[in-house]
């Protein structure tokens, strides 16, 4: 490379070449939801257009067809799935699963479901910055005992936000 530069540009050119040692190949990270076949996100740039209703109806329809279904209410700032599934009074709890404390999803209509709405009072405003909301969402995904699922439905918040970025960076949406 140095000879070519001097031949075609000028002999007076000073060439400094820095090389970098190749990084060792890193092991492929473990998938976050290894027992889930399909991950479907229901989203829209606008609020109030029926995302939560579509997500709930999709989950119920798939469950009625015999599929194993999980639903995550990822709308951290306006969770509505607990009400739609008549689970407003559900109290989340954890159990030891394979030596790790895991959150156990609520279950209704043969659908496993988690929502941030289970952890906050309905009339309480969520004043979380992006990182806090994203970390809460990651925990609802990775630290829950979802078991084997055919479909994992994500009810996303309106717009594009840190939540959406977290979802696409954390799990392979089908």
Where are these regions (language model features)?
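Conserved acidic residues
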Residues: 111-112, 150, 174
């Amino acid at each position: 490379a140095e000879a070519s530069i001097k031949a075609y540009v000028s002999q007076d050119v000073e060439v400094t070449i820095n090389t970098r040692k190749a990084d060792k190949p890193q092991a492929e990270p473990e998938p976050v939801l290894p027992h889930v076949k399909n991950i479907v996100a229901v989203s829209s740039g606008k609020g109030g257009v029926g995302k939560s209703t579509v997500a709930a109806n999709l989950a119920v329809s798939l469950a009625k067809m015999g599929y194993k279904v999980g639903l995550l209410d990822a709308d951290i700032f306006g969770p509505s799935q607990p009400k739609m599934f008549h689970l407003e009074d559900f109290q989340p709890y954890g159990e030891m699963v394979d030596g790790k404390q895991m959150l156990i999803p609520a279950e209704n209509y043969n659908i496993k479901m988690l929502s941030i709405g289970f952890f906050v009072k309905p009339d309480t405003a969520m004043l979380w910055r992006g990182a806090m909301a994203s970390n809460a969402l990651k925990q609802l995904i990775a630290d829950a005992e979802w078991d084997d699922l055919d479909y994992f439905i994500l009810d996303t918040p309106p717009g594009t936000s840190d939540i959406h970025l977290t979802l696409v960076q954390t799990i392979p949406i089908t």
